[in-house]
A protein has these predicted regions:
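Extreme N-terminal leader/anchor segments
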Residues: 1-52, 58-60, 64, 94-101, ...
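Alpha-helix boundary/N-cap detector
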Residues: 29, 139-142, 279, 313
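Long, hydrophobic/aromatic-enriched structural stretches that serve as scaffold segments
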Residues: 52-105
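Extended, helix-rich structural scaffolds rather than catalytic motifs
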Residues: 2-24, 238-343
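Alpha-helical transition-metal enzyme core signature, strongest for iron centers
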Residues: 75-83, 106-121, 141-148, 181-192, ...
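Inter-helical turn/loop segments and adjacent helix faces that build the functional surface
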Residues: 89-101, 123-131, 163-176, 194-214, ...
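Acidic/His metal-coordination segments adjacent to aromatic residues that form catalytic metal sites
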Residues: 51-74, 134-183, 201-206
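Long, hydrophobic, well-ordered secondary-structure blocks that form the structural core
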Residues: 88-161
């Protein structure tokens, strides 16, 4: 562990070690992200699912319910997979205490999301057998298993790596972080959010939509942190991001899109009015292009967002919620959130 200020300035984010020195702070942007995350606090207990339960029983078709059951099954384990990667791979290799502070907060938020989805399961699937099936979906439902296998492949890519020392190991780390930000949070979860907001556009499932607003905000911040890490590493070690690495990123997102489209084919198999496979493919390509831009790469698909209900989703509710938290707990945020800005 170094304590000399001059030597600290020479250290890079992926240098092996476990730096503990916060002053002088090398990456204040990570510390500010941590502080912003603290202000974005919310609790699952503030979500009311009563109207949702009524909607499920009286206002939804069999095709709608199939979509929801598949969505809940994906949510049952999705955030736990992200948490595992944070603990097993990211925390030990980002050698800046301010970055690890943010990861600690992100881990808390992922646990909060797990609690939200557990509460969702308890309300939407009161039958214990159905709940068990939802948690076993990563093994028993092919479209969800395909996404899980994609995730596990990238977790395994770093799991046995104790120190990042070579150029190839640094590339491995970057690809893992890009995968979990751009593919898992930025495609798998953002596609799931699109289904939620589709139901919201029909006036259905307000409890699910309210909780998703807050999860959406958290996940957007998680992605921005990961992209900032990638930009920082790229500026410190520009030689890592060569043409071969860029092609790996393109191929990775293309594979993730195909995994998510297999899930879309499953969840939309009953014929859900108002959303199609073509819509979902274009939406995923649109999201991927936004991620390429964040990574400093040329866009590949050049398509618009085909889902009008994803252009601006309930900004006033988000604003009012966080303003209430400022008054009551002094941990809220103010301002507007426009979901069409990046997604």
């Amino acid at each position: 562990m170094s304590t000399d200020a001059a030597s600290l300035t020479k250290q890079m984010l992926l240098d092996p070690g476990f730096e503990l020195t916060l002053r002088p702070m090398r990456y204040p942007q990570f510390y500010e992200m941590y502080r912003d995350a603290i202000r974005n606090s919310w609790t699952v207990e503030e979500i009311n699912f009563q109207i949702d339960i009524s909607d499920l029983h009286s206002k939804m078709t069999a095709a709608d319910r199939h979509l929801i059951h598949r969505l809940v099954a994906f949510f049952a384990t999705g955030d736990s997979i992200v948490s595992n990667n944070l603990v097993l791979n990211l925390y030990q290799h980002l050698n800046a205490p301010e970055a690890r502070m943010y990861l600690s907060r992100q881990l808390y938020e992922e646990a909060l999301h797990v609690q939200f989805y557990l509460t969702l399961l308890d309300n939407y699937l009161p039958d214990p057998t159905e709940r068990f099936k939802a948690f076993a979906a990563v093994e028993n439902i092919p479209s969800i298993r395909k996404k899980a296998e994609f995730c596990f492949k990238w977790i395994d890519s770093l799991q046995d790596l104790k120190r990042i020392e070579t150029r190839e190991q640094r590339r491995q780390f970057l690809l893992n972080q890009i995968c979990f930000a751009a593919c898992i949070e930025g495609l798998f979860f953002f596609a799931a959010f699109a289904y939620v907001y589709y139901f919201r556009s029909r006036g259905l499932l307000p409890g699910l939509a309210s909780g998703t607003n807050w999860v959406f905000r958290d996940e957007s911040c998680h992605m921005e942190f990961a992209f900032e890490c990638v930009r920082t590493i790229r500026s410190e070690e520009p030689g890592l991001f060569d043409e071969a690495m860029q092609q790996q990123v393109y191929d990775m997102l293309e594979e993730a899109i195909e995994c998510e489209l297999a899930f879309a084919e499953d969840v939309l198999s009953g014929g859900v009015a108002g959303i199609s496979m073509r819509d979902m493919r274009q939406y995923l390509q649109h999201c991927a292009d936004q991620h390429f831009a964040k990574l400093g790469l040329p866009q590949r698909y050049h398509v618009r967002n085909p889902l009008p209900f994803m252009e601006l989703q309930d900004v006033q509710e988000l604003t009012n919620f966080f303003e209430r938290r400022v008054s009551a707990y002094q941990v809220g945020v103010s301002g507007e959130v426009a979901f069409d800005h990046a997604f």
